[in-house]
Amino acid sequence: MTYYSKYSTPFGDVIIICNEKSLTGVYFYSSRYFPVEANNVSANDKCEIIAKTKKWFDIYFSGKCPDFDLPLGISGTDFQKKVWCIISQIPYGKTVTYGEIAARLSAQNGGKKVSCQAVGHAVGKNKISIIIPCHRVIGANGEMKGYAGGIEKKIKLLSLEKENSTEDN
């Protein structure tokens, strides 16, 4: 069974999607990949994963880095999963470039070249926004590049993290 619930962030509402075992999606309502079937859903706060996700968001949007993980149900290609794994390791308040991710993947693949565009495509297919922090991936020279929720939200998320980032976060 699939469960849906809405959560209001300071930057716009998101839809939280999960099943009995894991979180499977977080989308801003303005996202270009917003799942159409989630348009008219009612809250289902009885689902433990939704409750934990909302707690995670409460902590995050209060300016702190949540200190617990959520069970993630990630679906995608092997390449996408590798990219999302690297993204998940980007520390709170920090950013990396598409090129840095491509270089890391290349090193993991015995030096086989990985294009920044392929990385960008995989980043764009992330279904669990904010929690898999694709907003922390930027273009060369600090340029703000695509974000499914919109560049404005990406900038706000990064600003929130930078304003509240400490070595202990």
Positions of predicted regions on the chain:
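Regulatory, non-catalytic segments
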Residues: G110-I128
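Basic nucleic-acid-binding alpha-helical/helix-turn surface characteristic of O6-alkylguanine DNA
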Residues: M1-V114, L160-N169
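Mobile beta-alpha loop/short-helix "lid" or hinge segments that flank ligand
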Residues: L23, I128-I130
